[in-house]
UniProtKB/Swiss-Prot annotation:
Specifically methylates guanosine-37 in various tRNAs. It catalyses: guanosine(37) in tRNA + S-adenosyl-L-methionine = N(1)-methylguanosine(37) in tRNA + S-adenosyl-L-homocysteine + H(+). S-adenosyl-L-methionine binds at G116, I136, G137, D138, Y139, V140, L141. Keywords: Cytoplasm, Methyltransferase, S-adenosyl-L-methionine, Transferase, tRNA processing. InterPro entries: Alpha/beta_knot_MTases, tRNA_m1G_MeTrfase_C_sf, tRNA_m1G_MeTrfase_TrmD, tRNA_m1G_MTases_N, tRNA_MeTrfase_TRMD/TRM10. One of its GO terms (biological process) is tRNA N1-guanine methylation. Its EC number is 2.1.1.228. Its main location: cytoplasm. HAMAP family: TrmD. This is tRNA (guanine-N(1)-)-methyltransferase. It is found in: Cytoplasm. It holds the Pfam family tRNA_m1G_MT. The lineage of its organism: Bacteria, Pseudomonadati, Pseudomonadota, Gammaproteobacteria, Pseudomonadales. Homodimer.
């Protein structure tokens, strides 16, 4: 009997008792079909306050999760489950989690889920370590734990022996909107990767323009359907064209 191993990087591991102690997923754990292990980035900090977040470069509200505690927690998860495990970040910027996508994930031997908090996680962690980003809808939650539990629940239902049949319920559609821009926090340089200069400039007008351009570009590349019902202003069209020119020239 195969066991799906799910490693979760989260600041709130106790939340996942909802998966391991209740319902179909709990039964799957008891049957040996599912194993869920949590890794808390706070356990990998070195300061007395166990700091896992910092202010975003370029200003703005909220905090951004720091890269080093995330990397160290991920390293432990990889060691436990194997380097081949797919790393998934639960994010409103990700692709829509459909039943077809869940079927593919259910075929994996192991998964590593990253549950963010605050304004998100340092973009450099995503670029370096995340294989896929998945979203459960175009709405705001306090963190990635609930989406991670949704994914685990949906995948578990497709494991042979967990249900006795496959649930093929349809997923709800997204509402319209733009995806978020990249976020960065300290350090300014990590593994030879620099934060974009505009975010260090202190010029708030330039920062706002850069963020809107990145948001438009990401939406065009990842969720072009969201732009179909959105009327872009002249400035937004100009920014999107500029983004595409810069992308093609790079």
């Amino acid at each position: 009997m195969d066991t799906l191993r799910v490693e979760v990087v989260t600041l709130f591991p106790e939340m996942f008792s909802a998966i391991t102690e209740y319902g179909i997923t709990s039964r799957a754990v008891k049957q040996g079909l599912l194993q869920v292990t949590c890794w808390n980035p706070r356990d990998y900090t070195t300061d007395r306050h166990h700091t896992v977040d910092d202010r975003p470069f370029g200003g703005g509200p909220g905090m951004v999760m720091k890269i080093k505690p995330l990397e160290d927690a991920l390293a432990s998860a990889r060691q436990a489950t194997g380097a081949a495990a797919k790393v998934i970040y639960l994010s409103p910027q990700g692709r829509k989690l459909t039943q077809q996508a869940v079927k593919g994930l259910a075929e994996q031997e192991s998964l590593i889920l990253i549950a963010g908090r605050y304004e998100g996680i340092d973009e450099r962690f995503i670029e370096a370590h995340v294989d896929e980003e998945w979203s459960i809808g175009d709405y705001v939650l306090s963190g990635g734990e609930l989406p991670a539990m949704v994914l685990i629940d949906a995948v578990t239902r497709l494991l042979p022996g967990a249900l006795g049949h496959v649930d093929s319920a349809e997923e709800d559609s997204f509402t319209d909107g733009l995806l978020d821009c990249p976020h960065y926090t300290r350090p300014e340089v990590y593994a030879d990767q620099r934060v974009p200069d505009v975010l260090l400039s202190g010029n708030h007008a330039h920062i706002r323009r850069w963020r809107m351009k990145q948001s438009l570009g990401r939406t065009f590349e990842r969720r072009a359907d969201l732009l179909e019902s959105r009327s872009l202003s002249g400035e937004e069209k100009k920014l999107l064209e500029e983004y595409l020119r810069e992308r093609d020239d790079s």
